[in-house]
Amino acid sequence: ERMGVRRYHLLHPSRVYQALEGYWGSQTMGFTPAMQHLRFTPVPTPPVPVGLSLPEQFVAVRWYQRATWPLREELVDWTRAMVAAIAERMPVVVLQSSVYLDDHVDFPVPEGPNIHHVIAEPWRENLAVQSAILKRASAFVGTWGGVAQLAVRLGIPPAACYDRWHSCSYAHQ
């Protein structure tokens, strides 16, 4: 009512999982039959916030701790080296959060002349701000997870990394 919608259909996520169980559950359904159940539509993104200046072309990066990318010294070093290597070739925009509501703590990423750190604020608009920035990026590089999957949905080429594959649904591979 509050949104002025009088009639609607509710699609519970369990319906999607049921329809595609043969693909990611028992693995008895191939890719082509699974695709017959899906219709992809563009993801609407808000504009970049007023006052936020971005390079004309850039690679968006988002590195954070999760089960598949634990906060270990060798991964921190590798991540820093990766961001620095990208920044030698093209501007980098580091997507960061100002608040942590789960276990996804940002990896420390280097400062540098071609590295732009953007903290998405206010925190309630974190995903909207990151989505707006990501939509403008030439590519995404970062931790395998929700932001990498968002890049795919936005049509942005991703390179997403994981150290060890566990604590993830088969559907997320």
Across the structure, where does each feature detected by a protein language model lie?
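A nucleotide-sugar donor-handling region in carbohydrate enzymes
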Residues: 2-64
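Catalytic donor nucleotide-activated moiety binding site of glycosyltransferases and closely related
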Residues: 61-66, 79-127
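A short, glycine/small-residue-rich beta-strand->loop->alpha-helix junction that serves as a flexible
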Residues: 66-76
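Hydrophobic/aromatic beta-strand patches that form the interior of the parallel beta-sheet core
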Residues: 93, 141, 157-161
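Alpha-helix capping/helix-boundary segments
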Residues: 99-100, 146-148
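Acidic, amphipathic alpha-helical patches
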Residues: 130
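Acidic donor-binding loop of glycosyltransferase active sites
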Residues: 135-141
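Nucleotide-sugar donor-binding patch of glycosyltransferase catalytic domains
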Residues: 148-173
